């Protein structure tokens, strides 16, 4: 019996306003989860994440299992005890990271054998091992182990990949056993609607606490992503959280909420921050550009983050040019605050019954 509770508070069209409740805290949805691959959101402390409004973060099963390993994390009680984040944590299963290894992996019915990117040793990961690792981490939301279907994939390749993921989903559910953490199933099927339908039907039959759409934002054209979202999102169970994995840009989030998605994660705001790409209410600023050398205005006059309240574009340009660590930190604080503020604005618009209007205005003004 899971300790997670999901309340669907309000709907506007397909867009949903909800709340996910855990013993460690509530998550207002639609929600964006900052990514802490190795247990930390790069350059930020848990206090800073809370200040910007984050209510859940994502950790990476694959990387934490390889380093530092679950024995060390278990000595701290859980990943929460290890990294000082006392709110909910979602961990992905490791499937996407294994997919990212490409030819360095060997896939069988049992699982995946690959060369460790840490020390080049031979490593085996299966649904059962992934579930045990996530249990050891004390994750609040556990993702079932799947194979992320690559893009492009023929219909035959996508079908075989999806069917393997569904067999692994069943094994994940069995291995999850009496773990009170929530277990989410992942819909696969590539760019083929009928395969997505088959996948969702199978996952409903196995019965999960939440449902995720995987295998998007893997290199496909934007129109294909929207097509699959349009087809799939609203068919996911109404009474359970819906999670779109690894997506995306601010526009992607607004468009996915419009289609019925509740939860998101993406490395984009933090990774782009380190490369000097800043999200603002009017679009992206490339702070490396010489035109900001003597610009004394803040990044975004509509933003209340620490960076915007205290520093100018000129100073941030200087930090970027001199490769100061502080530049990455200040950019990351701003970008992740921008994402959290976007989700707050979406939730407020849904609360007030004007999300459709908000979407039109946002898509028109955001370049």
Swiss-Prot record:
Please give a single GO biological process term from the UniProt record.
Answer: tRNA wobble guanine modification
Q: How is the cofactor bound?
A: Binds 1 zinc ion per subunit.
GO MF terms listed in the record are: metal ion binding; tRNA-guanosine(34) queuine transglycosylase activity
Its required cofactor(s), as named, are: Zn(2+)
Q: In which pathway does it act?
A: tRNA modification; tRNA-queuosine biosynthesis
The record's active-site residues are 92, 265
Q: Which Pfam families match?
A: TGT
Which is one Gene Ontology cellular component term of this protein? cytosol
Q: Which controlled-vocabulary keywords does the entry list?
A: Glycosyltransferase, Metal-binding, Queuosine biosynthesis, Transferase, tRNA processing, Zinc
User: Where are the residues of the annotated region RNA binding?
Assistant: 246-252
**InterPro entries the UniProt entry points to:** ArchSynthase1/Queuine_TRR, TGT, TGT-like_sf, tRNA_ribo_trans-like
Q: Which family does it belong to?
A: Belongs to the queuine tRNA-ribosyltransferase family.
Its subunit composition reads: Homodimer. Within each dimer, one monomer is responsible for RNA recognition and catalysis, while the other monomer binds to the replacement base PreQ1.
According to its UniProt entry, what is the function of this protein? Catalyzes the base-exchange of a guanine (G) residue with the queuine precursor 7-aminomethyl-7-deazaguanine (PreQ1) at position 34 (anticodon wobble position) in tRNAs with GU(N) anticodons (tRNA-Asp, -Asn, -His and -Tyr). Catalysis occurs through a double-displacement mechanism. The nucleophile active site attacks the C1' of nucleotide 34 to detach the guanine base from the RNA, forming a covalent enzyme-RNA intermediate. The proton acceptor active site deprotonates the incoming PreQ1, allowing a nucleophilic attack on the C1' of the ribose to form the product.
Name listed for the protein in its UniProt record: Queuine tRNA-ribosyltransferase
Q: Please name the source species.
A: Francisella tularensis subsp. holarctica (strain LVS)
């Amino acid at each position: 019996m899971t300790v997670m509770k999901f309340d669907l508070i309000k709907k506007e069209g397909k867009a949903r306003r909800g709340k996910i409740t855990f013993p460690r805290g509530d998550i207002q949805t639609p929600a964006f989860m900052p990514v802490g691959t190795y247990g930390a959101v790069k350059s930020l402390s848990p206090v800073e994440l809370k200040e910007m409004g984050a209510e859940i973060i994502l950790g990476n099963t694959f990387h934490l299992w390889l380093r530092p390993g679950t024995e060390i994390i278990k000595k701290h009680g859980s990943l929460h005890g290890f990294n000082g984040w006392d709110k909910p944590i979602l961990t992905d299963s490791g499937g996407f990271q294994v997919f990212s290894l490409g030819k360095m992996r060997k896939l069988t019915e049992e699982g995946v054998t690959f060369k460790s990117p840490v020390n080049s040793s031979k490593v085996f990961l299966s649904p059962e091992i992934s579930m045990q690792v996530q249990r050891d981490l004390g994750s609040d939301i556990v993702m079932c182990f799947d194979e992320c279907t690559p893009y492009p994939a023929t219909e035959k390749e996508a079908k075989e990949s999806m069917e393997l993921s569904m067999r692994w989903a069943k094994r994940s559910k069995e291995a999850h056993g009496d773990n009170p953490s929530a277990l989410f199933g992942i819909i696969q099927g590539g760019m083929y609607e009928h395969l997505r339908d088959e996948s969702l039907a199978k996952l409903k039959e196995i019965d999960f606490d939440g449902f995720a759409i995987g295998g998007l934002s893997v290199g496909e054209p934007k129109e294909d992503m929207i097509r699959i979202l349009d087809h799939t999102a609203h068919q996911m169970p109404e009474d359970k959280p819906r999670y779109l994995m690894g997506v995306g840009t601010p526009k992607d989030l607004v468009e996915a909420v419009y289609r019925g998605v509740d939860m998101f994660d993406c490395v984009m705001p933090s990774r782009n921050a380190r490369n000097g790409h800043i999200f603002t209410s009017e679009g992206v600023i490339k702070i490396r550009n010489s035109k900001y050398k003597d610009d004394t205005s803040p990044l975004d006059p509509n933003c209340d983050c620490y960076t915007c309240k205290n520093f100018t574009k000129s100073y941030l340009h200087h930090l970027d040019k001199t490769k100061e660590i502080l530049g990455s930190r200040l950019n990351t604080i701003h970008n992740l605050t921008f994402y959290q503020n976007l989700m707050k604005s979406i939730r407020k618009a849904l609360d007030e019954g004007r999300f459709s209007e908000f979407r039109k205005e946002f898509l028109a003004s955001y370049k």
